[in-house]
Amino acid sequence: AADERGSATAHGVFRREVFDVLGSFDETLRRGQDWELNLRVREAGGRVWFSPDLQVTYWPRATWPNLVKQFYATGVWRAEIVRRYGARNSARYFAPPLLVLGVTASLVEAVLQLTGTTRRWPRFLRGFTSLVHVPSAAYAAGIVTAVWRADDAGLRERMWFGLVLPSMHVSWGAGFLRGLATG
């Protein structure tokens, strides 16, 4: 695969001159220091490159609860980065919090439907509010598709993948919303 220009890269390799000119990582950030440095590189006219030929060794969290805590904390700090740098953040950083809001709205609507509360509503309103389930259903279908397409994984790995992926997205999104609300 060919190298390509990117907006940010984790585990980046930088020339010494980058730090001499732009300074080091922003130590006031507990997460996202790499993204912030990549932003300064781009704003100074530099380029960030992604090369699939480069490899790093990464040790993931040993337990599922620790993974959830990690992604929650990362979401909290991403909200701080959004607060500091606003529109310079990619739209993809808003997908996990929108997922959390969408799933929450879907759950509220489901409870209202199951308790019969929506029966008193006009038919057009019931139909309209039922549309709130579409994004959650699409997300669930995407997870099922990702698990299904994991050709090199056995059944156990696929089951974990089906649990871990939404756990990462939801915990990150919930952390982001908390970080946005509490500053």
Predicted regions and their residues:
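Membrane-interface anchor segments at the N-terminal boundary of transmembrane helices
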Residues: 87-98
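A recurrent flexible, glycine/aromatic-enriched loop bordering the glycosyltransferase active site
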Residues: 1-17, 21, 30, 36, ...
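Membrane-embedded multi-pass helical conduit in multi-pass membrane proteins
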Residues: 99-182
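Catalytic donor/gating beta->alpha subdomain of glycosyltransferases that bind UDP-sugars
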Residues: 26-89
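Generic alpha-helical secondary structure signal
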Residues: 9, 14, 66, 70-73, ...
